[in-house]
Amino acid sequence: MADQLTDDQISEFKEAFSLFDKDGDGCITTKELGTVMRSLGQNPTEAELQDMINEVDADGNGTIDFPEPLNLMARKMKDTDSEEELKEAFRVFDKDQNGFISAAELRHVMTNLGEKLTDEEVDEMIREADVDGDGQINYEEFVKVMMAK
């Protein structure tokens, strides 16, 4: 199933994986997953974290090793409930819940994920997604960017 992903998608997932894999050992533990989830304002229980790991953990070793998320991502990208996941992701970015992602909100989330971006990089990300040119990203623009990945 992972063979349905493009090289670009695989390298993006590898980059995302490394944001979770804090110690760089090639495995994501429940502790590392919890750290990232909490940095995004979520508060999962240990059992929820273990369930998330189990959903992806193909070899049953209790952690997520890199190739494992690829099959999950290929499945998720085909899922019809991705609409709800997109709405949830948008809500994570849209801190003040005004229906728009501002440069400050984008910078905040990316910083929490460990991505130190310059103002220029954040502005460039906004510009790429900002179809109507109002300087922020609305839900429709967000969906376009996420579906284009």
Curated annotation (Swiss-Prot):
GO cellular component: myosin II complex
Transmembrane segments: none
Residues binding Ca(2+) 2, per UniProt: D57, D59, N61, T63, E68
Keyword check for Chaperone: no
SMART domains named in the record: EFh (SM00054)
Residues involved in Ca(2+) 3 binding: D94, D96, N98, E105
Residues where Ca(2+) 1 binds: D21, D23, D25, C27, E32
Disulphide-bonded residues: none
InterPro entries (alphabetical): CALM/Myosin/TropC-like, EF-hand-dom_pair, EF_Hand_1_Ca_BS, EF_hand_dom
Role of this protein: Calmodulin mediates the control of a large number of enzymes, ion channels and other proteins by Ca(2+). Among the enzymes to be stimulated by the calmodulin-Ca(2+) complex are a number of protein kinases and phosphatases.
Protein name: Calmodulin
Organism classification: Eukaryota, Viridiplantae, Streptophyta, Embryophyta, Tracheophyta
